[in-house]
Amino acid sequence: MLIVVGPSKHPPGSHEVAAGGRLVQACITNLINLPGVKAQVVYEWPPEKSVREAASTVVFIGDTFPLNRWPDSKKSLAELGDMMQRGCGIVCLHYAVGLLGEDVKPDGEHPLLHWLGGYFAHQTCAHFHSVARIFSAATIVSAAPAHPILRGWREFTVNDEPYINNYFGPNNNQPASNVTVLATSLLPPEAPKREAVAWCVERPDGGRGFGIVMPHFYKNWRNEDLRRFILNGIVWSAKLEVPAGGVKTAPPDLEQFKPASVEYVPPPPKPKAKAAN
C-alpha cells in the first residue's frame, strides 16, 4: 500500500497529515488479525514507476487532493490514472477528498469524482459548494450494514469536522449506481438532514475507492470505531478480505508519530485593525 502525504497549513493538532500518514502505516502494517500487509509513506508523488506499480491501493492525506497542490499535476494525475486503469484502489481521508475551483471544470468534472465516487467541493467551485464546519457532537451511523467496511464498529459521536453537502455528480447530486453511501450523520443540528460522510465505489476498471471526511482533529485517531472504519476501508480498497469483526489494532500512541501537537492549538487571534483618525 502507498500512503501519500500532501501539504497542509492547518494549526497544530488539526489535520497533522504527516503524523496521520505515519499512524496509518503503523496500523496497517501491524494489524492483529490481518498480518503481513506492507505499506510505505511518501511525502511527494513518487517519480519511480516501480513504486506506483507495486501499490494495491493509494491512500491520500493532505489539505485538498494532494496531486492538485503539487507541480506537474497534469503528469501525476495521468500516472494515477494509469494506476486506476489497472484496478488499483484509492482512499482519501478528510480534506484529501477536497477539490478547489481551479482544480475542476466549470461543471465540476474531475477524475477524482469517478475514482473515489464523490468529493468535497470547496467554496471556490462554481458548480457546487460543500460545507466545512466543526460540530461538537456529530453522531456517525452506518448506512450500509452488510458492507465489509462496516464490520466491527458501532455508531459513535465525535467532536470533529465531518464535511456535509459533499458532491456526488451532476444527477441532482445523487451518487452513481456503483457508489455506496457507508455512513451518515444528521447535520447541521439546527436543520438536521441525513448527510453522507463516508462512501465507496466499485469502478468499471475493477478498482475500488473509499472516501471519508474525518478526522479533522488528530486526537480523534484514538477513537477505536473511527479508526477501525478507516482501516477497514483501506483494506477493502486493496481488495483484501476485511475480517468478520473488522480489523484489529493496538491503541496507537499518538505522540509516537511526531505531530506538532496531539491536542488542538488554535491560532492566535488576528490583531484588530486600528481605527482611522
Task: For the regions a language model picked out, list residue spans one by one.
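Helical hinge/lid and interdomain linker segments adjacent to catalytic or ligand-binding clefts
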Residues: L2-V4, S8-L100
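Active-site-proximal beta-strand elements of phosphoester/diester hydrolases
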Residues: I3-V4, L182, F210-M214
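Short, solvent-exposed coil/turn elements at secondary-structure transition points
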Residues: P7, W45-P47, A96, E155, ...
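Active-site rim elements
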Residues: H10-G13, A132-A138, R154, L187, ...
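Extracytoplasmic/secreted proteins, especially bacterial periplasmic and envelope-associated proteins
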Residues: A19, L23-A26, K75, E79, ...
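Extracellular ligand-binding/catalytic regions of CAZymes and related secreted enzymes
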Residues: L23-A26, P188-A196, E202-N277
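A glycine-rich, often tryptophan-bearing local segment used as a flexible ligand/cofactor-contacting loop or short
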Residues: F65-R151
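Catalytic beta-strand/loop cores that center a nucleophilic Ser/Cys/Thr
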Residues: A121-G206
